[in-house]
Amino acid sequence: MSDSPCLSPPAPSQGPTTPRKGPPKFKQRQTRQFKSKPPKKGVKGFGDDIPGMEGLGTDITVICPWEAFSHLELHELAQFGII
């Protein structure tokens, strides 16, 4: 045979050489930050007005959060983590 230039075998077709990346990973915030200030309590302390609570004094604070925040809607209470 003669010394003719050899044809090299065709290069195998390869896909992209960059490795495939998964979805981005998100870090969860440790503290909850609110854009607005939490609501203030509307009613503080009932004293002896509550039936069955006589004798506890007049310096007691609200027992039930829905009584303290009765002027707000449920979604507003949930927004600030009150309920």
Curated annotation (Swiss-Prot):
Pfam families per the UniProt record, alphabetical: PDE6_gamma
Catalytic activity: 3',5'-cyclic GMP + H2O = GMP + H(+)
TM stretches of this protein: none
A GO biological-process term: positive regulation of MAPK cascade
Highest taxon of source: Eukaryota
GO cellular component labels: photoreceptor outer segment membrane
Keyword Coiled coil appears in the UniProt entry: no
Xref: InterPro entries: PDE6_gamma, PDE6_gamma_sf
Region (Disordered): 1-51
Alphabetical UniProt keywords: cGMP, Hydrolase, Sensory transduction, Vision
One GO MF term: cGMP binding
Bias-annotated ranges (Basic residues): 22-43
The enzyme's E.C. designation: 3.1.4.35
Enzymatic class: hydrolase
Record note on quaternary structure: Tetramer composed of two catalytic chains (alpha and beta), and two inhibitory chains (gamma).
Domain notes: The C-terminal region is important in conferring inhibition.
Similarity section: Belongs to the rod/cone cGMP-PDE gamma subunit family.
Function comment: Participates in processes of transmission and amplification of the visual signal. cGMP-PDEs are the effector molecules in G-protein-mediated phototransduction in vertebrate rods and cones.
Name of the molecule in the record: Retinal cone rhodopsin-sensitive cGMP 3',5'-cyclic phosphodiesterase subunit gamma
Biological source species: Rattus norvegicus
Gene: Pde6h
